[in-house]
Amino acid sequence: MAAAVMLGAAGCRSKSSAPGYRGPVIFGTVMYKARIALPPDAVLTMRLLDVTRRDAPAVVLTEKSVSGPGQPPLAFELPYPPEAVRPDRRTVVEARIEVAGRTRFYSPTAHVVTTETVMQPQEIWVEPAP
């Protein structure tokens, strides 16, 4: 199992804004179809969740927020602990865009990340919040 984690982490980017961080990073883009520009005070929040147990709330493995992310496609890098993505867990990436403290866009479907896909660029689509 440790070998699978190491293989999964080997291809990940190891660049992070955290000083001294040398661990794996999930990377990719967040996009939406709406023809709406984001204001400068928008906040993009990315979370890696463990949703293995269906009878329990999701466990937040890591979270990162970026203020003023620009316009779509929004590039992201989400550092995570190497042991977070394992074959025996179901892990998903969640994206949310907030403006003035209110959710404007969110990812309505689970974006599953596995040991095989974690090293590839992730493409997360978000939809307008209800």
Positions of PLM-derived features:
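A short beta-turn/strand-edge loop motif at beta-sheet boundaries
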Residues: 35-41, 55, 85-86
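Short acidic/polar inter-strand loop motif in beta-rich domains
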Residues: 94-107
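A short, amphipathic beta-strand motif
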Residues: 24-33
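Short solvent-exposed capping/turn motifs at the termini of beta-strands
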Residues: 32-34, 50, 80, 99
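Sec-dependent bacterial lipoprotein signal peptides
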Residues: 1-10
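Tryptophan-paired
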Residues: 52-85
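Extracellular beta-sheet/turn segments enriched in Thr/Pro/Gly and aliphatic residues
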Residues: 73-75, 113-130
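Bacterial signal peptide processing site
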Residues: 11-15
